[in-house]
Amino acid sequence: MTNNSVSLHRVIKASPEKVFRAFADPVAHSTWLPPYGFICTIQQMDFKVGGKFKMTFINFSTGNGHSFGGEYLEIKANEYIKYSDKFDDPNLPGEMTTSIWLNKVSVGTELKVVQEGIPDVIPAEMCYLGWQETLEKLIKLVEPEIPDA
């Protein structure tokens, strides 16, 4: 972890295709992306290079939310996603860039996340904690293999 950036690494017992789908599908994305205690509403999600997204994280305890949006900069199916985003709140200035690598390994997918340009008013450790929770939720979504009845 360096100032204004965080880096995370996980190995997930699911295929890169399944993990990638969790990023690409708006309904799936809204279930695992917000940290614990938050819900997510997606107003726009055009998952393609140059496509825009807009969403809101809502604190379930207080009902207060913060909105943010951005653009998908690079997408390579089942391998790589890069997007920019910024908060609507003028007190959280600047644009962040997030890069996600998916690498097929013997037990599933090696996932690496790097987020850069985090606003100075957000402590990096708070952002890191949020990402840890987010990735726990992602893992709980993609690791189970549930057959159709």
Segments and roles (model prediction):
Residues 3-9, 16, 52, 67, ...:
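Intrinsic-disorder/low-complexity, polar/charged segments enriched in Ser/Thr/Lys/Arg/Asp/Glu/Gln
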Residues 24-25, 34, 77, 142-144:
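Residues at helix-coil transition
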Residues 110, 117-149:
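A conserved amphipathic terminal alpha-helix motif
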Residues 19, 23, 29, 53, ...:
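Hydrophobic pocket/interface hotspot
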Residues 46, 51-55:
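N-terminal glycine/threonine-rich, aromatic-flanked beta-hairpin/loop signature
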Residues 30, 36, 44, 58-105, ...:
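Hydrophobic-ligand binding "helix-grip"
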Residues 1-39:
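Hydrophobic ligand-binding cavity/cleft-lining segments
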